[in-house]
Amino acid sequence: MNYREDLEFQLQKVTLAIQEVVEDVYISDKVRQERIRKLLNFKETIIYKGRELRIDLEAA
């Protein structure tokens, strides 16, 4: 797996994790917002790393 594929895979995993948090009915809104915030920060980091390396990420 090359670096681009690795970043795309990580981006897909984060996107799925965000969706799972959104759909989780067993956590409070405060916890949900905190988890989403952390996952979005991680997603932005992955996208930034791709841009830094001049990699066009398809999942973004």
Regions of interest found by a model, annotated:
Residues 36-46:
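Short amphipathic alpha-helical coiled-coil/interface segments
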